[in-house]
Amino acid sequence: MIFATLEHILTHISFSIISIVITIQLIDLLVYQIVGICDSSEKGIIATFFCITGLLITRWIYSRHFPLSDLYESLMFLSWSFSIIHMVPKAGNHKNDLSAITGPSAIFTQGFATSDLLTEMHQSAILVPALQSQWLMMHVSMMLLSYAALLCGALLSVAFLVITFRKNTDIAVKSNYLLIGTFSFGEIQYLNEKRSVLQNTSFPSFRNYHRYRLTQRLDHWSYRVISLGFIFSTIGILSGAVWANEAWGSYWNWDPKETWAFITWTIFAIYLHTRTNQSLQGVNSSIVASIGFLIIWICYFGVNLLGIGLHSYGSFTLTAN
């Protein structure tokens, strides 16, 4: 009873803190450069990390198994993973471009985990025989860490595409205006003078330079985070194959979860391959990563919604009240 109450308290504290963090980030976005507001956001994420860590440890103690046996526990672990990814750039004293991704992702996953849809899973249950293995921690934790990293990397690629295509759209609109517009002599003289000034300087406009630097950072972090997630995914799939052989006598069975895990792994393997080709980097590789974003959600929620296959334990059904 004490552990259940403590878990309930930690759940609401962590959700409240992450909600405040999102609010702070929105204020920082709308009201530029408020002194100390960014530091408060970082401290909030750290506090959330410790709250979720305490929650998972508490559930581990009173359930007597690693808390990764159902969708509720996996969502809480996924939220915990997002908070870790958020803190990685800060530890290296890098500009944290991940904060706009990790914060909302953490609040979304934790909000869904604590919703009424998963009420039946809030109470820990005895593990089914197939899950009573030491491979549970290794396999499931690696897969969830890979989901968190791949989702963050894919969202960074989506942001890269949005900024890039928006820039191209602005250029196209301006080009059409120049082609179809009629100019007076004064307007033509002004454009010629402006072009002359731009040709005589070696620096692009501040706005274009800032946008260029932002897209480069997004592309850079997307590649690094996806590479990390791909490593976790590979380890998770291999450890899962070993566990499957021990539990069911076969390394691979092509059930829905395994099939979509393989598709996810293949998509991001293609992404990493495009990164080795200079001509395919940037937009092309980001498109592949964006496709991977959809594939991950199908892989993660698909089996739980269908409730079929060898990985159907921990699934949930939508029932009317």
Curated annotation (Swiss-Prot):
Gene Ontology cellular component annotations, sorted alphabetically: chloroplast thylakoid membrane; plasma membrane
Recorded topology in the membrane: Multi-pass membrane protein
Record-annotated membrane-spanning stretches: 17-37, 43-63, 143-163, 225-245, 258-275, 287-307
Domain of life: Eukaryota
Complexes and interactors: May interact with Ccs1.
Family under the similarity heading: Belongs to the CcmF/CycK/Ccl1/NrfE/CcsA family.
Protein name, as recorded: Cytochrome c biogenesis protein CcsA
Organism: Drimys granadensis
Recorded name of the encoding gene: ccsA
